[in-house]
Amino acid sequence: MAGLVAVVLVLSGCSGIGNPEQTRACRALADQVPGIAGVTRATFTDAMVGGLPRCSGDVVVTQGLSTTERGRVVGAVYDVIRTRAVKEVDFSTSFALGGGTLTVASGFPTSEQATRVMEIADASHADPVEIAYARGSLLATLHAPLSSTVPAASLREGVALLRTQPPAGFVELDWYLGQDVIVAPTLGVDDASRLDLLASWFPKNPAVTSYTLRIQAGVQTWTLVTSQEVPDVVRGFGAAARAGTTVKVSASLPGKPPYLTLP
């Protein structure tokens, strides 16, 4: 979120769809958040979302606040209800940050936690960003650009972001990089180092013109696009990528179905 300039959070009057404690908490947000320093408008709505009662919020925050000040606003919003007997998954808030957006889909991030995530977003120019309650902690999802479409350069740039460790209170950072060229969580040191080394494979094999990479549950799934059918080159990539990890590879010509798939 280059230059995260403003924050918008959404809230409106609560109609009592959820349990009584949730409804009271939603009303407290609607009543108290407009008075928080740095908030220019706030509405919360108690409504059914995905078949479940949720308190959804929108808050507009003063333009020109620093990252720390914006983090304080986010934390102060959840301070209103943090100690109430309500579930973190029953509340969601959308923040408009000038040129970017932050959604707290669930969870009650503190000022410090919100600030740390926005600092990472600033540094990576990530937009949008989502914070959610996950596995008893928080998880942040960041969509960030890659400055290069050259395979070796984009992979190295992506790996640099995947090395970013989650702030305190977050179990994981999930990244969607370069319009989903790379989709992966935070990597450990060994996995990141292996991918860095793999980047040097691409300049030696120019028939591979682009790739996508998905990493989930420790499995790397690579989709290669080649300028011509080069099965031996693809097999060589699979062997190089497979060192120390589980890998799936497929290769295709532009706009065509795969001509080779490696389990």
Predicted regions and their residues:
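N-terminal Sec/ER secretory leader and immediately downstream segment
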Residues: 25-101
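N-terminal export and membrane-targeting signals
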Residues: 1-7
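Short edge beta-strands and adjacent turn/loop segments
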Residues: 37-59, 129-139, 174, 207-222
